[in-house]
């Protein structure tokens, strides 16, 4: 029931201006683009497509996925106006059915941290399935300051769980606009496949 309510709220937010939809790509993504050759990228939880458009404009072949149909509708309008080619799909990040890799980059600006804990393992299985060996996962998320804290955010033990199949290239801790603890992570999948 809680998951259904969250889905409704996300869909509803896209009838206005969601607080996370700034229309500006973050410097972490821009730095990544500047320092890596274009390849295939997936924007998981792409919203209205701002970051997918940034990637496509830089030469990446991009797929954007979001579970909110309204977000994908708005993204299609923005993509059309930008004159770029992006595959946009209404998909749940814990399933990603019909999306095949390999992707050189999976980008996630606040999607993973909002998934209910029991869905995160499914998300990570999908990520492992679609990410190319040597591929990157650039992810932003809120952090939990207490191990048993409820709500949106990642606990340190969850970051440790990710490290069982991805290598941490860098981590940048900080605070969001509301002074909530958050971090950017750049993970890389090893060249040899790891089962999770």
Language-model features and meaning:
Residues 110-114:
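Short catalytic micro-motifs in class I SAM-dependent methyltransferases
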Residues 1-42, 48-101, 115-126, 130, ...:
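Class I (Rossmann-like) S-adenosyl-L-methionine-dependent methyltransferase catalytic domain
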Residues 107:
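A conserved beta-strand element that flanks and buttresses the S-adenosyl-L-methionine
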């Amino acid at each position: 029931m809680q998951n259904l309510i969250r889905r409704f709220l996300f869909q509803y937010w896209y009838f206005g201006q969601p607080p996370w939809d700034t229309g500006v790509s973050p410097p972490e993504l821009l730095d990544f683009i500047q320092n890596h050759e274009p390849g295939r990228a997936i924007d998981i939880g792409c919203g209205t497509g701002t970051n997918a458009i940034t990637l496509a404009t830089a030469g990446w072949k991009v797929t954007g996925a979001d579970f909110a149909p309204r977000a994908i509708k708005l993204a299609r309008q923005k993509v059309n106006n930008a004159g770029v080619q992006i595959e946009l799909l209404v998909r749940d990040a814990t399933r990603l059915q019909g999306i095949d890799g390999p992707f050189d980059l999976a980008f996630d600006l606040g999607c993973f941290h909002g998934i209910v804990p029991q869905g995160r393992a499914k998300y990570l299985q999908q990520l492992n399935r679609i990410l190319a060996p040597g591929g990157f996962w650039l992810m932003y998320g809120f952090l939990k300051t207490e191990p048993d804290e409820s709500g949106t955010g990642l606990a340190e033990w969850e970051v440790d769980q990710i490290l069982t199949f991805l290598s941490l290239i860098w981590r940048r801790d900080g605070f969001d606009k509301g002074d909530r603890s958050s971090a950017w992570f750049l993970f890389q999948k090893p060249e040899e496949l790891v089962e999770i």
